[in-house]
Amino acid sequence: MQPLDPEAESLLRDWIEKADADLEVARRMAAEGADNLRIREIVGFHCQQAAEKYLKALLTRCQIEFPRTHDIKLLLELAGDPVADSLPGAKWLTPFGVAIRYPGDAAEMLPGDEAKAIEIASQVKDAVLAILARE
């Protein structure tokens, strides 16, 4: 890969820092109140946000332009087959990025889904950081 200019390098670090913060918030909230539907929804939101930001960090590093989107499937497609193939469950998080935040549109987070969301977001993190470490 081509070296990044300082601005893109800073953006890459920002994406990762923000994703790390989202994942940490999700973990803490799940530990505090996974028995509460609204808390589970917030956990799902932060997991979706974390996965989205990790993927945007990867796309930034690969110098692949991406639209303003919360669509994990689209971001995976832009990242390419090896990444998309290694994270088949990641697109499950997409509805938790927007729809879950508004009344009437929510994809329901069932008990246990918060753990699944955290696991998927963690898998995205691990995959992205492994790729970035090779560069």
Residue ranges and their predicted role:
Residues M1-E135:
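Terminal alpha-helical segments
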